[in-house]
Each structure stands twice: as structure tokens, then as C-alpha cells.
């Protein structure tokens, strides 16, 4: 019998059918090759939006800079960055008037954070531009390198461990006439292999000292490295994103702390909350507008889109905002917060790797690094690239482009949200002084605008007024990409609203499945994803049960761990069958050891080991949870781990899952090919860093680990901790006198070695 698919929807309210429109099967697109072209696009576009501004030259670096602020008034329809300082300041003043004390309180909260934050805050985050090596590194390594260079140049305030003191060093480093850095390089030589008698290339890694004069150092300190944004769906063209270096990071962190504190107090802000909390916040604003539009008023909502939000924002505006927000605060605090926008007004964009050329006839490939773009003959390039390079040439210095206007992606999300909300705030009747009024939601560059008025003309007038007010602060609402609807149906940050937010379960589909970390983590993540979707995304019990069965099937195929009594033959089936036969309590075997699945939708919150513990044979328990098992490279697992899950839309999300350490929590070994490259020195530094941190955590289990106060080093802290613990253990009879004496002796030896060093 044929089924007419429309019958499926007869009983379903229209808004619930959204999950059937899922377009994102398959992998998202990734970028290959260099991001140089995309970065040049960004730089050129940003300058084009501000082209009527005034040019000036930076006295320290010699970089040409364009300043569009307080220049010509913006025009209708054309996106531009011509923000007017007095308009921004006025918007801030009205925001404060409607929220008395908001800036004052946020400043006090931030001041406390500034005084307490440790420098290790900067180790969070992925890739960071490492100015000492002039390329990207993991954040922790980049920070370690920066501090190492600072100390060897006599900058030692950072030793207190406070972030604010590290920032003092950053400020001082910019006044120095020169900075000495250590760079890694590699030498290649051809040598004859003794065994095979063939010629092979041998690489050796060296470190060499290099001096940077003030100008070169400043350029590096102000550089944002650029990469291509990966895995963006629904776009034909890729685009560039930026990673700032360690000099900028700390200052940005404090500014964003202040802005976050303000956003938390603004009902129209979609940041910093997320998920259900965000939905509740937004639903409140909509409810307010709908209740207030009594029978006499019309209410319309614009699902908004802004043209090139980042490229039209201007750091000088952010400086004005901060100056206003902190106007009654102590001088030191105002200075710390104004440095980030000042650095951004003088930023340089690194053009990335450059271009790759290949000659088909001569089978040659050659890389043109970004540094050479300033004076290479343009006849080698195609039309579009030639135009880009010609346009960007006046801005180039040492392979970086001077980029004063614009913000680069994702740098001041919170602060730009404050700016957006300040315009939404102006929609109250006491400010519009007419019959129309507006309110809305803002989350970084995404917005929804709700306009109420007695008639259609009023709605139109309200939208126009909002559009033009935005223009005055450098926000360009796109008339082409925004659409208007009766209030009750709109989209905001991929949440779809139709008489309430609709659960769009299909957006979570890509995060179902086996993650590929290890058997233990994958099982845990898989069931947690299903559990979370039952809680947050209307995943019904029947569908969840089906998802669970599909997941278990997927898991068994991935790890080739079909049940011990199955007929399926795989590489592992011989071993698993043997285990199955010699196990008394078969229900106790983990799924990854060929056991049965005991999960159902009621017990997804229990880790599998705990679920089956009582059912396990004793010797199986002993093998499974044995930290001394020599075949396991064990990582110590906190009771909660974080996994990165990929929804179809938006950024990768971090999700917590329960982790029980068993012999299945193995870590794959690192690829060996890295050991022969110039990365090797860096890798060794990184491993040492890791080892020190792990050792430190052994001495200070997280329960008792308070942030160190004062200036004792890690070694001193560990030695004194060891002595205290040993004394307690000795006095309570947990260790013998000989052991106690030995520990004390080791501690003294360590101190002696430190003194000699």
C-alpha cells in the first residue's frame, strides 16, 4: 500500500514539522590551501566601507591608517563604517538612564575580576598567534614563550602570577628599544645512510637568538594572524577569521568581562546565556511586546541581518563607549580597559601563508610568502588576485596589512552586543516621542526587531527610524536580507519562534553517532547526547529509544564488538567469544567487550561501568578498573570530562559527560612524523609544560587546590606540600618512620639543587 506522505502531517502543528526540513547531511566544507586571498578581501572591503575617512600615518610603525569616525554622515542603502561619536555616547547615556547604576555595578564587578585573575586564564583557547615564532601555537605554549622572552628581557612583573602584572610587562615591552627573542629554525643536510648506502636528508633543529627593534616588535605585538573559517555551511565563499597574540589577549579579556557583566543585566541581550535560558529571556521580550500591542496596535517583527557587522564596527567607537562606561572609575582601571580598543585601532592583519604557484610544464611548485607580495611582478597572477594585491599594497608592512577600521571576527562580541542593545533601548515611547515604539533582541551581529504602531505607516516609520539610528553608530541593517512578519513568527540565532520557540531537533543530528575518542568516552558521549536532546529538544521517548538502538549498533560496528553470541565475524570476534564463554555473569560485560546493552531511556544518566558493576564477575572487575594494568596508557580522569559536539549550525559546543576510568579509556599515541620537523622543539616544550602541570596537580588535588597567593614557585609549593602531607601521614600512622625520613631527605635534596642552579 502506498502512503501519502502528507498524511504524516495531518495531526502535527506546522511548527513541529521544522525538523523534517534538515538540509545538512554529509560533511561540512573545509578550506584548503592558504587564507591569504580571503584576508586580503577582508582588509580591502573594510577600507572600502570607510573610504571617505581621513588617512594618517602611525608614528611608531609607519603604518597608514584610515579613520572614518565623525567623517561624512552615512548614506542610505550603502553599508558604511561612518559612526558618529556623539551618537554612540548619547545611546550609552540613554541606556544608563533606563538601567540606573548598570555601568557602575558592572565596573565594580570587573575591577574585582581584574585584581583576581591569574595569568593562566590566557592558556584557555585554541590556536593563538605566537609572536616569538611568527605563527600559530596552542595558547599555553604561546603564553609560555611570551613569558620566557619577557623574563629574558628583564620584564619580571608577571612572576606574581596575576594577569594584570603580566599586562604591565606588555605595556613596558612596547617602550623598549629592542627585544631579544629565541626562534626555532631547521638545518637540512644530505648525508649517506650507513645501512642502505643511499643519500638521505637529515634535519636538525636549532634555536637562535634574534633581536627585534622597537618597530618590528610593535608590529608583531599588534598583529592578528588570520586563518580560513572551516566547516561553514550554506556559503559559497570561505572567509577569514583572526587570532590575536598574547599581548592583546589579556586586555581583550578584561573588556569582554566588563561587557559580559553589562549584557547579563540587559533583557534584550542574547549573550552570554545560551540554550533554554536564552529562549526564556527572549520569550519574555516577545511576550511584553505582544501584551502591550492591545487590540488597537499592530505588532511586526523583523528577522534581522546586518551587512558585514565586524567590518563596519570601529575600535575607536569601542574606546568612546569604554570611556563613557568607566567615567567615574579610578584612573588605572580606565587605562587598562582602554588599551584593547587602542591596540585594535592600530592592528595589523597577517596575510597568512601566501600563494602557491605551480608550473604544469616544468613540474615545479613554489610558494610566494606574503612578505613578497609588496614587490613581486603582478603578471604571474590572475585578474582578480592582481586587483586585490594592487589595492592592498599601500597598506603592507613586513607581510602584514595595516587594518585600523573594522574589528575582525569574534573579538568583541559582548561589547558590540551592548552597542546593539543601546539602539534597541531607544525604541521606548519616551524616546521615540511618537505613536510607534520598538524593542528587540541582540546577540553579537544577529538581531530581531519588534515594532508596534497603530497602523502600517507607523510600522514603516518605526523601521526607518531604527535603520537610520543604527547607521549613525556603524550598524548596517541589510534591507535585502531582513524580512518582516506579524509578531509571533521569526528567527533569531537559529532559534525559530512560532507562538513560542520551536524545538528544532534536526539541528542536533550531526552530534549523534560515535565520536571516535575511545571506547569508554564514546559510549558515555553517545548516551549523554540522547539524554540532553530528550531534555532540551523535544526528542520523544519512542524516537529516543530508536536513536539509542541505532547508536549501540553504530558503536558495535565501529569498535567491532558485537555480542559474544553473535554470528558476525570480525577481527575481534575470536577474542570476544572466548571472553563471553568464560564469563559467568554475561550481563556484566561492557558493550565494548561483547556484552549486552543494558541502556534504555530511563538510565541514560548512569555511566555503563556503574550500571553493570554489580553484575560483573570479580576477576573482570579487577581487570577492567585496574590502574596498574601495564597495557593501558592511563590518563587520570576527572569525574566529568568535556566533549566537543558539532551541531549543524553555529559553533562546536562543549558538552559534559561522566567519565569513569577503565582500561577502555586509552589515548591514541601521537603521530610520529611530527618528531622529525621543526615542530619538535615546540612539542618537547609543550610536553614539559604538560608534565609540570600534571605533577603539580598530583600534589594539589583539585579539591584542595586554591590559586596560589604570593610569589612562591611551583617547586617550592610542591615541596612544602609534600612535607606537610608526609608529617600528617606519619603522625596518623599511615607511613613508617623510614618512609617519612626518606621523603624529608628528597625534599631537602630538591631545595639544595634549586639553590645550586
From Swiss-Prot:
EC assignment: the record states 2.7.7.48
Q: Name one Pfam family in it.
A: Flu_PB1
Compartment(s) of residence: Host nucleus; Host cytoplasm
Going by the UniProt record, its keywords in alphabetical order are:
Eukaryotic host gene expression shutoff by virus, Eukaryotic host transcription shutoff by virus, Host cytoplasm, Host gene expression shutoff by virus, Host nucleus, Host-virus interaction, Inhibition of host RNA polymerase II by virus, Nucleotide-binding, Nucleotidyltransferase, Phosphoprotein, RNA-directed RNA polymerase, Transferase, Viral RNA replication, Viral transcription
Write down the Gene3D superfamilies for this protein, in alphabetical order.
6.10.140.720
A GO CC term attached to the entry: host cell nucleus
The catalysed reaction is: RNA(n) + a ribonucleoside 5'-triphosphate = RNA(n+1) + diphosphate
In its record, the post-translational modification comment is:
Phosphorylated by host PRKCA.
Principal localization reads host cell
Span(s) of short sequence motif Nuclear localization signal: 187-195, 203-216
Please give the residue ranges the record annotates as the region Promoter-binding site.
Answer: 249-256
Q: Some GO term, biological process aspect, for this entry: which one?
A: symbiont-mediated suppression of host gene expression
RdRp catalytic domain location is 286-483
Select a single GO molecular function from the record's annotations and give it: nucleotide binding
Residue numbers spanned by region Disordered: 53-82
**Which family does the UniProt entry place this protein in?**
Belongs to the influenza viruses polymerase PB1 family.
Instruction: Note the subunit structure.
Output: Influenza RNA polymerase is composed of three subunits: PB1, PB2 and PA. Interacts (via N-terminus) with PA (via C-terminus). Interacts (via C-terminus) with PB2 (via N-terminus); this interaction is essential for transcription initiation.
* Role of this protein: RNA-dependent RNA polymerase which is responsible for replication and transcription of virus RNA segments. The transcription of viral mRNAs occurs by a unique mechanism called cap-snatching. 5' methylated caps of cellular mRNAs are cleaved after 10-13 nucleotides by PA. In turn, these short capped RNAs are used as primers by PB1 for transcription of viral mRNAs. During virus replication, PB1 initiates RNA synthesis and copy vRNA into complementary RNA (cRNA) which in turn serves as a template for the production of more vRNAs.
Q: Which HAMAP family match?
A: INFV_RDRP (MF_04065)
Q: What is this protein called?
A: RNA-directed RNA polymerase catalytic subunit
Q: Which organism is it from?
A: Influenza A virus (strain A/Duck/Hokkaido/8/1980 H3N8)
Name of the gene: PB1
